[in-house]
Amino acid sequence: TWAVLSGAAPAKHAARAMSSVRAHLVRRASGVILLLTPPFDKTALDPGYIKGYIPGIRENGGQYTHAAAWVVLALTRQGSGDEAAELFHMLNPINHTRSASQVARYMTEPYAVAADVYDHPEHRGRGGLPITNTAPRIRHCPPCRSDRREARAGR
């Protein structure tokens, strides 16, 4: 996403980077946008504290919602507004708690944005702790801002 957000990469390279994000990090079926894949569990290399998390949990291959918001922002900067809106709705906790089975899986309040969402096979879709800076990160995504403008305009 930073290839797009920084403006430092040529458009061709930024488009390729976002194509890789779509192919490897966006998991529509489970409703998450992963921070990285594969998780650090089969390497002798030590990337630091994230290897201490179980694979698919938090920063070790789960959704880190701050970074997922940057994906949404990068898509809007590229002019992919419909896709950005789709992914934005994947970040909305309400959309993880629409049924009893979703509530049982998410295990986090539907009114609080989770800082992370797990992608571990045994815990896929479970929300982590709500961290105070996560919601403002989401709030500043363009799809959210356009929703607020439409609400104020009475649409």
Which residues are covered by each model-predicted region?
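Acidic, mature catalytic/reactive cores of soluble proteins
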Residues: T1-R155
